[in-house]
Amino acid sequence: MNAAKSEHIILISPVGDLSTELIEAIAGEIQRVFGFASAIDSILQDLSFARDHNRNQHHSTMILDQLAANAPARAIRVIAIAQVDLFIPILTHVYGEAQLGGTACIVSTFRLNEGRSGMNISRKYIDRIVKEAIHELGHTFNLRHCPEATCIMHYCRNEEDVDRKSDELCRYCKVMLEDEIIRINK
């Protein structure tokens, strides 16, 4: 991966109590895949503004808007890791959502960790959450869903799809990411 400018960071914003092991795993993959250092800072703690009481879920797009608005200037991207069940109006649930080519994305541990708390987490679930975190961050770097089933940018309908895909970008997506990072570093 091309060396990123040192002043650029990707901010990891945990919402609630999440395991240190999970956050460190996400930070390590951010460095490996995107070449950017990460920082950890909880910029949103209360997600009640996005709660839909009829669905008993949180509207992820509303959270993205707040994340982007509250991201510090030094963060070129911000990813929230939350434990709430997320949705967008056209789908019953989502594992995460991102602003395509934008600043913010979010991943929920809720369905990927089968409703367990963010502190009680196995390696299998850490791997799932990390894959989806990298997937959502990929969207912020203008990567679209990939038809290659093993690419980390492949769209997943269920947990088995997440388990099946690798933690790597396919050759095409890797080139697209490298081009985007060159553009950012100009």
Role assignments for model-derived ranges:
Residues 11, 78-80, 105-106, 152, ...:
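Generic structural signal for residues positioned in beta-strands
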Residues 115-186:
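The catalytic-center signature of Zn2+-dependent metalloproteases
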Residues 16-133, 144:
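Metzincin-family zinc-dependent endopeptidase catalytic domain
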Residues 6-9, 75, 101, 167:
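A structure-centric signal for secondary-structure junctions around beta-strands
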Residues 1-5:
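Short boundary motifs at domain starts and secondary-structure transition points
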Residues 6-18:
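Fold-level signature of zinc-dependent metallopeptidase catalytic domains
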